[in-house]
Curated annotation (Swiss-Prot):
Gene Ontology MF terms in the entry: rRNA binding; structural constituent of ribosome
Keywords, alphabetical: Ribonucleoprotein, Ribosomal protein, RNA-binding, rRNA-binding
GO BP field: translation
Function: Binds the 23S rRNA.
Subunit organization: Part of the 50S ribosomal subunit.
Transmembrane among keywords: no
Entry protein name: Large ribosomal subunit protein bL31
Organism: Microcystis aeruginosa (strain NIES-843 / IAM M-2473)
Cellular compartments per GO CC: ribonucleoprotein complex; ribosome
Gene3D superfamilies for the chain: Ribosomal protein L31
PROSITE patterns per UniProt: RIBOSOMAL_L31
rRNA-binding as UniProt keyword: yes
Family per record: Belongs to the bacterial ribosomal protein bL31 family. Type A subfamily.
PANTHER family noted in UniProt: 50S RIBOSOMAL PROTEIN L31, CHLOROPLASTIC, LARGE RIBOSOMAL SUBUNIT PROTEIN BL31C
Length: 77
């Protein structure tokens, strides 16, 4: 069996977000740079914005002509 095939394990790897140390984890890299983590993500901080998707659905229905309830197959019967 080949020896030394596993990467080096860093049990105290630093997770850095915006130049600030946010936590330590175990990793195969000594430093991990992230843009978003649970401390600044809107879902976890309670600053989540609700997105109005009704306009998107209406646009989809118009685009594929699914907006009307009566279909041609139903009229032919």
């Amino acid at each position: 069996m080949p020896k030394k095939i596993h990467p080096t394990w860093y049990p105290e790897a630093k997770v850095i977000c915006n130049g600030e140390l946010v936590m330590t984890v175990g990793s195969t890299k000594p430093e991990i740079h992230v843009e978003v983590w649970s401390g600044n993500h809107p879902f976890y901080t309670g600053t989540q914005k609700m997105i109005d998707t009704e306009g998107r659905v209406d646009r989809f229905l118009r685009k594929y002509k699914m907006g009307d309830k009566s279909s041609k197959k139903a009229d032919q019967k």
